[in-house]
Amino acid sequence: MDKNDLVQKAKLAEQAERYDDMAGAMKSVTEQGGELSNEERNLLSVAYKNVVGARRSSWRVISSIEQKTEGNEKKQAMAKEYREKIETELQDICNDVLGLLDKYLIANATAAESKVFYLKMKGDYYRYLSEVAAGDAKKTTVDNSQQAYQDAFDISKKEMQPTHPIRLGLALNFSVFFYEILNNPEKACTLAKTAFDEAIAELDTLNEDSYKDSTLIMQLLKGHLTLWTSENQGDEGETGEGEN
């Protein structure tokens, strides 16, 4: 199918909230090679974020049920089997995205903004893998996630304004990684606070087009800081809702 037709198909699928179809169309666009436009890049990101998000949410629900059914072997075995099925789906989706990133997207990215966007995405999808991994696999996915986030972070600090929504979104997700995956609230808070303060100091550089995106992410950073620094930290799972 022609690239423009695939993009149109992805937009239709998004309107219909059929995100698996949307992801399939954007995967085909990516596999045609060449650099994606901003619009195409965002369509790809939205599609897979919804596809993987549904599985992450399901996995958390079933994991919780599995823990609550201790003492009832049959129920627990059924929950475990179902969790593993969801886990496999989640891993396949993440590996799909990581394959596209390594084979096409990161390699073809020329602008700093694109490189940061894709490296952040790489960090995100290794983070999602690490949430369901154990043992050596967990260590590998955590290390890969941190490396991708760090690479993106270094480029963003050099090449992008502190108010840029992609730089802010990266800081948000990297701080969530430190809090939830590395259990390092101190580092998470420092990173989020620095990103927020640097953006506040340069509010006059806010781009009119991205004003809404930037201020929304700044609010999320502030919300996380409040949650993480309060004595009653609540349920850590709540943090994930404020990802970019």
From Swiss-Prot:
SUPFAM superfamilies: 14-3-3 protein. Its main location: cytoplasm. One of its GO terms (cellular component) is cytoplasm. The record marks 56, 127 as: Interaction with phosphoserine on interacting protein. The keyword Cell membrane does not apply. It is found in: Cytoplasm. The keyword Transmembrane helix does not apply. InterPro entries: 14-3-3 (IPR000308), 14-3-3_CS (IPR023409), 14-3-3_dom_sf (IPR036815), 14-3-3_domain (IPR023410). Induction: Repressed under stress conditions such as netting. Keywords: Acetylation, Cytoplasm. The modification N-acetylmethionine is found at residue 1. Expressed in brain, gill, heart, intestine, kidney, liver, ovary, skeletal muscle, spleen and testis. It comes from the Eukaryota. Adapter protein implicated in the regulation of a large spectrum of both general and specialized signaling pathways. Binds to a large number of partners, usually by recognition of a phosphoserine or phosphothreonine motif. Binding generally results in the modulation of the activity of the binding partner. Homodimer, and heterodimer with other family members. Belongs to the 14-3-3 family. This is 14-3-3 protein beta/alpha-2.
